[in-house]
Amino acid sequence: MKLTDLLYGKYRNLLLATAMFNLGFTIWFSFAPYTGEIASEFGLSVADLGIVASAAIVAVPLGRIVIGPLTDKYGAPVTAGATLVTVGIFSIISAFATTYAVFTGSRIIASLAGITFVIGIQHVAEWFEEENLGTAEGIFAGVGNAGAGLGAYFTLPRIFGDGYVDPIFGSAFLATSVNWRAAFFYTGVLAIILGVVYYVFGDPAKSEAKREATKAGVSWDQWKFIVTRYGAVVLSVAYIMTFGLELAMNGWLGTYYREAFGQGDIVIAATFAATFSIAAGLLRPLGGYISDYVYKKEINLLPWFEGEYRNQWTFATLVYVMLTMFGMTAAGLTGNIYIAVVAAFLVGLGCAFSEGAIFAQVPAMFPDNSGSVAGIVGGVGTVGGVVYPIAFSHALLPNLHVGYTIVGASMIPIVVLTAWVFQPKISEVANDKGWLVDDDLMAGVKGAPGDD
């Protein structure tokens, strides 16, 4: 591929989607490196910061579920442009906030940057053929996810760190308020600019026929049937304990390293936190690749679920993630921040592998309806990012290390449900059988053409 190819067709749209997702994640977690300054500004406790971390995610689950069909109907350039401009405006508003209520409210709206994942997934799928779709989605998701680590945790504190002088905020606010306000303001401006660029230069699909098929391929009855199948439900709750955990850790680790280990240097604490984000983001495509590999080579990784090769890999990654939560508590109790950083990196590794594995299974289980399932999995999975920070920071905990064990214990029912669905006799009907919606009544809907 030549450099000029990036200016045309599918590569231009992949580049736009990836840039959108990366900036979206940077904005989504831009508050995390500055929790110390924000806490001082508004007089917040550690428990209050946990609530702020949850508030930054609370609008995303419903937003992801809603934006999926809207993107199918109106096209990614329209929904991406509208989302980025809205996010940018409220990020700028949060930069000028002088009360806790205004700050929290504006960050909730700015958190809609997290729905850019669903927009990008749909847009990339509209342009790439099936044989290249896994690689394209892997690039999009991996580089985009890294926005939380490389963008929010690594880059922003180095640009807008201690001692930063800004021509706008330096005169309007105290010097201690400059860095985080400037970070929110300038990332908001970038979002507005990218939103306009996306709308002008993005194309919704590779052909008009593809565009019309996507618009016509979704109905309310079809959506209800698909999202209540065993496979869709188990992948959704599994995404809570993987991607939801990633969101929670991205928003919490900076505070954890500072409060639990007395690491007050914003750049060092953010760098430690970034190791998790980089592992969880950049290594994600490897999880999908391994799922493809064990499937093609018919490798039985576990003595259970014989012949269910993708299921075995996904289940192994989920068990690993659960165990690493207990490992985080053990590492923290040593009192050694470097051991805790390594433990968090291992958690990030598990998140990367499991997320890649889960989204390798979405089209495998639902080849005709992967877009609809991706929307519900992505939306439900975000719930973990709302709930887990509260468990990490609850005021009744004896210390900040025990919260990880509580979260790990909460994952056990999800792992048990996954084991049940992944049994060969259940797995083979996981896209036909389900809960709530009558199987026989809706059986005809399953075969209707979907997004892909």
Residue ranges and their predicted role:
Residues F29, A56-I65, I115, G149, ...:
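Residue-level signature of mid-helix packing/kink "hotspots" within the transmembrane helices
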Residues L62-A101:
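Conserved MFS/SLC helix-loop-helix module at the cytosolic interface between two early adjacent transmembrane helices
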